Curated annotation (Swiss-Prot):
Name this protein carries in UniProt: tRNA (guanine-N(1)-)-methyltransferase
Binding, S-adenosyl-L-methionine: 112, 132-137
Organism name: Geotalea daltonii (strain DSM 22248 / JCM 15807 / FRC-32) (Geobacter daltonii)
Top-rank EC class of the record's enzyme: transferase
Assembly and binders: Homodimer.
Length: 244
């Protein structure tokens, strides 16, 4: 999986890409992240990449010429890549979107800045627009980092255990069940006995029920699209009655 990131601040990616899972994935050749400094594609000696908006208004707008040149440079190496713009206008990012993007061979991610990009960049190059949520970030770099991390986790071989991705929160539309490790007791709080029983069928049932409970309590909106069995629905109905 290849990621081409178009940014004014490539240094922001140094930490996330050189630690933990992403570092190992890059070392194994499972993912490739290429950073492209948009300033390198400016047409003047001052490397100007933004300008005042036509029609007036506050802030600056990212210029079309350097962005166009930068996108075309990335496309030369990844001609089949989907071009993504990080922007508040975009569709909300989710596990389902990450899974969709993970099926691509390559992604080109444009990191928006300031008041946004010249609209002609959208018209000429952008295939998809993605937002992390209804809040404002300083720039699209942090959104790009989140996209790279979430998508990379779904690339075969990136995680130590394939079950890790399957059991992640949201993988089946539900929040994850509670996790415990040693010691079995801490300050009077004990690990649920079922997890120590060795009965894998009961453990799986406990985890499923706890996942359903957490989702119903914290993110009930997810239940509308979650993959629920008849047993799940009966358990939720019983839990709701017991809580009254």
């Amino acid at each position: 999986m290849k990621f081409d990131v178009l940014t004014l601040f490539p240094g922001m990616f140094e930490g996330p890409l050189t630690e933990s899972i992403l570092k190992r994935a890059r070392e194994k050749g499972l993912i490739d992240v290429a950073l492209h400094n948009i300033r390198d594609f400016a047409f003047d000696r001052h490397s100007v990449t933004d300008d005042y908006p036509y029609g007036g208004g506050a802030g600056m707008v990212m210029k079309v010429e350097p962005l166009a040149a930068c996108v075309e440079h990335a496309q030369a190496g990844s001609p089949e890549a989907r071009v993504i713009l990080t922007t508040p206008h975009g569709r909300p990012f989710s596990h389902a979107v990450a899974a969709e993007l993970a099926r691509e061979e390559a992604l080109i991610i444009i990191c928006g800045r300031y008041e946004g990009v010249d609209e002609r960049v959208r018209e000429l190059f952008v295939d998809d627009e993605i937002s992390l949520g209804d809040f404002v970030l300083t720039g699209g770099e942090m959104a790009a980092m989140v996209i790279i991390d979430a998508v990379s986790r779904l690339v075969p071989g990136v995680l130590g255990s394939e079950e890790s991705a399957i059991n992640d929160s949201f993988a089946d539309g539900l929040l994850e069940y509670p996790q415990y490790t040693r010691p079995s007791e801490f300050r009077g709080l004990e690990v649920p006995k079922v997890l120590l029983s060795g009965n894998h069928q009961e453990i799986e049932m406990w985890r499923r029920h706890k996942s359903l409970e957490a989702t119903a309590l914290l993110r009930p909106d997810l239940l509308q699209s979650a993959k629920l069995t008849n047993g799940d629905r009966k358990y939720l109905e019983k839990s709701s009655k017991d809580a009254r």
